[in-house]
Swiss-Prot record:
Residues 1-21 are annotated as: Disordered. This is Nucleoprotein. GO terms for molecular function: RNA binding; structural molecule activity. A motif (Unconventional nuclear localization signal) lies at residues 1-18. It comes from Influenza A virus (strain A/Memphis/2/1978 H3N2).
Length: 498
């Protein structure tokens, strides 16, 4: 049960497939991409968007959000039952940006959810195509991970803002299924569990009765998902303890926070997938490319090749730097918010800077922002090399890390040493080794103490030239170790607010 996530490949999770071979997986992922692309083309027609407007990432985000909201059954039911003033539960919409007389104008559109569902199903051969919806959720999640630092959320659950490298997927909706669970970081799972336990502490009936049984099985399922992400026996044993607790409370919260901290050095396996905005898939399908026939993978060269040949535009605020906006979106496209910046710079072929040094806010434009001063520019999403995405945490070693983020969660399977600030991390592990989990705690601390600075992760793995589609000649990068490795360094990234 523990390693339920590791039994099937990530593409199989992506497409709900039973064991398929590589060709079948590539075809079913391709089919999913085709569906998103066809839907996007149809929406651009409905909205009468020009080619340029259809390639605007802000329009893409609105269209993606509309279809996700149209299929959000729980929220739709909730809205039906709790009508709020000025909100039609049957409609969905958002800002669409058009170029009128040399200026960008914002237009608020509203559609029947039923109509959007019809267009989506039609684009997906009559299916609900849940995999495609999840794919868009993961793209939004990756964009949030790159744009915002979840300091407040971490502090609220009693964790430390420096643990932000564990927070991948923290904004994914609950309904994102197995593919969503695969990309969630250790910290995200721990945070969900802590929130659950806190509710149980405050609400006598949380674990009781018919609902309580459902709650309990959700709790155990989440514990198992988290257990499956850990790579050492002691960490997994600790998760068994948390899962089997009769009445989860503060002791379990302590254990969870302990295990999250330990994951800064004994990293868990977290999947990484390159999920691109719908406005990349649409034009590719429109140009006659058949993803299902050609096959597609989210963890290989395909997304890199697709981005090499795509034009995507973005609105730019008056004091934003288009190159910085490009970096933000590039990192989101490759699910690389918590990867080592030196490696990212090498793959991208241009310097990748920490979040706090970027002159750019998020990609979305708020409804109260002034459109008169809005410009648009091309996003540079191309890369110099490509590399295979990883779903392992790599093994560990140590290196000077920053005041903000004190560890990384690797995205690419490429040889390097993984930076983490051992003294800072170990300082958090003073004293408390009593209680039921004392032997596991002692064992985990011993392993962390033993993590060696000179150890190399992903030994022998390298990046590849874009012409090397079969990954035959790995190029092992060499790094300037004096450079800063963490993205959320000392940071002044905005907070993510729902």
């Amino acid at each position: 049960m523990a390693s339920q996530g590791t039994k099937r490949s990530y593409e199989q999770m992506e497409t709900d497939g039973e064991r398929q071979n590589a060709t079948e997986i590539r075809a079913s992922v391709g089919k999913m991409i085709d569906g998103i692309g066809r839907f996007y083309i149809q929406m651009c027609t409905e909205l009468k968007l020009s080619d340029y407007e259809g390639r605007l990432i802000q329009n893409s985000l609105t269209i993606e959000r509309m279809v996700l909201s149209a299929f959000d059954e729980r929220r739709n039911r909730y809205l039906e039952e709790h009508p709020s003033a000025g909100k039609d539960p049957k409609k969905t919409g958002g800002p669409i940006y058009k170029r009128v007389d040399g200026k960008w104008m914002r237009e608020l559109v509203l559609y029947d959810k039923e109509e959007i569902r019809r267009i989506w199903r039609q684009a997906n051969n009559g299916d609900d195509a849940t995999a495609g919806l999840t794919h868009m959720m993961i793209w939004h999640s990756n964009l949030n991970d790159t744009t915002y630092q979840r300091t407040r959320a971490l502090v609220r659950t009693g964790m430390d803002p420096r643990m932000c490298s564990l927070m991948q997927g923290s904004t994914l909706p609950r309904r994102s299924g197995a593919a969503g669970a695969a990309v969630k970081g250790i910290g995200t799972m721990v945070m969900e569990l802590i929130r659950m336990i806190k509710r149980g502490i405050n609400d006598r009936n949380f674990w009781r009765g018919e609902n309580g049984r459902k709650t309990r099985s959700a709790y155990e399922r989440m514990c198992n998902i988290l257990k499956g992400k850990f790579q050492t026996a002691a960490q997994r044993a600790m998760m068994d303890q948390v899962r089997e607790s009769r009445n989860p409370g503060n002791a379990e919260i302590e254990d969870l926070i302990f295990s999250a901290r330990s994951a800064l050095i004994l990293r868990g396996s977290v999947a990484h997938k390159s999920c691109l905005p719908a406005c990349v898939y649409g034009p590719a399908v429109a140009s006659g490319y058949d993803f299902e026939k050609e096959g597609y993978s989210l963890v290989g060269i395909d997304p890199f090749k697709l981005l090499q040949n795509s034009q995507v535009y973005s609105l730019i605020r008056p004091n934003e730097n288009p190159a910085h906006k490009s970096q933000l979106v590039w990192m989101a496209c490759h699910s690389a918010a918590f990867e080592d910046l030196r490696l990212l710079s090498f793959i991208r072929g241009t310097k990748v800077s920490p979040r706090g040094k970027l002159s750019t806010r998020g990609v979305q434009i708020a409804s109260n922002e002034n459109m008169d001063t809005m410009e648009s520019s091309t996003l540079e999403l191309r890369s110099r090399y490509w590399a295979i995405r990883t779903r392992s945490g790599g093994n560990t070693n140590q290196q000077r890390a920053s005041a903000g983020q004190i560890s990384v969660q690797p995205t690419f399977s490429v040889q390097r040493n993984l930076p983490f600030d051992k003294s800072t991390i170990m300082a958090a592990f003073t004293g408390n080794t009593e209680g039921r989990t004392s032997d596991m705690r002692a064992e985990i601390i011993r392993m962390m103490e033993g993590a060696k600075p000179e150890e190399v992760s992903f030994r022998g793995r390298g990046v590849f030239e874009l012409s090397d589609e079969k990954a035959t000649n790995p190029i092992v990068p060499s790094f300037d170790m004096s450079n800063e490795g963490s993205y959320f360094f000392g940071d002044n990234a905005e907070e993510y607010d729902n």
